[in-house]
């Protein structure tokens, strides 16, 4: 009996170690809708990004596959210097690869350079989207304050929220801005629709599989996006109330630039 126990103890220890490692691996992986840890990469000086982003003459970076199954984006600056961004979580043939190239090359979005991740499936918080849109539209600092019950004015993203609110691109809900809430697909489309000047929404939502889920306030924006080709069902799902992913935001901005151009709102 004692011999059996001596044999069983090492087996149990091995199982315990194995389970502990598995649980640790689970903790290290974030769900696509989890809060992204890239806040620090979005902290940028307002004056330094006033002219961020490209335009009709923008030259995108060169994409090359890397040994990790991801891709490298090599961006050439006006002075001829180059910088290579390595992403292990973006395959060169992914439906969002060109969009990632676009936002990285134009300086509109970034990734985690230390971990070499873009995190394409992660959701985008409202505060982060304010920073992204500020970069994309070439925003400039504004003196006008934005009064929200959940903002003190000391937040690193406050200047970008002020600009978004001042331009009428984003608002609050019940006196709060909800900076940590994830932006939905419909909400992202509404912001771009406003940036475009709320053009006449020609056409209908016929063929859009989630038309019944579109809110009354978002109908014109989604109709415009659907009929202009800003969103399609070829590459991913554009469910109105679903949290918009970083990959989807990159794609929206690339298509918007091709369709309308970047606006200095």
In which residue ranges do the predicted regions lie?
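N-terminal Sec-pathway targeting helices
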Residues: 1-12, 21
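Feature responds to low-complexity, polar/acidic, surface-exposed segments characteristic
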Residues: 9, 18-97, 110-130, 134-158, ...
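Mature N-terminal segment immediately following signal peptide/propeptide cleavage
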Residues: 98-106
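Alpha-helix C-terminal capping/helix-coil junction sites
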Residues: 104, 165-166, 226
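Catalytic cores of secreted/periplasmic or lumenal enzymes
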Residues: 222
């Amino acid at each position: 009996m004692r011999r059996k126990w001596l044999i069983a103890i090492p087996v149990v220890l091995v199982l315990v170690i194995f389970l502990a490692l598995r649980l640790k691996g689970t903790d290290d992986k974030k769900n696509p809708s989890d809060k992204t840890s890239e806040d620090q990469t979005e902290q940028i000086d307002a004056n330094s990004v006033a002219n961020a982003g490209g335009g009709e003459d923008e030259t995108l970076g060169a994409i090359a596959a890397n040994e990790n199954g991801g891709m490298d984006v090599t961006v050439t600056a006006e002075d001829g210097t180059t910088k290579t961004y390595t992403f292990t979580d973006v395959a060169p043939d992914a439906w969002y690869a060109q969009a990632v190239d676009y936002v990285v090359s134009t300086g509109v979005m970034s990734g985690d350079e230390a971990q070499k991740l873009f995190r394409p499936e992660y959701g985008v918080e409202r505060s982060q989207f304010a920073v992204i849109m500020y970069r994309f539209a070439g925003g400039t600092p504004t003196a006008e304050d934005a009064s929200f019950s959940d903002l003190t004015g000391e937040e690193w993203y406050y200047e970008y929220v002020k600009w978004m609110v001042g331009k009428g691109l984003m608002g609050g809900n019940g006196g709060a801005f909800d900076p940590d809430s994830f932006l939905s697909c419909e909400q992202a489309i509404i912001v771009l629709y406003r940036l475009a000047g709320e053009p006449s929404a020609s056409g209908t939502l016929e063929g859009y599989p989630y038309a019944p889920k579109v809110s009354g306030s978002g109908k014109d924006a989604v109709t415009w996006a659907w009929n202009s080709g800003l969103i399609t069902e070829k590459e991913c799902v554009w469910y109105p109330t679903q949290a918009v992913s970083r990959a989807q935001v990159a794609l929206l901005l690339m298509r918007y630039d091709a369709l309308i151009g970047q606006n200095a709102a």
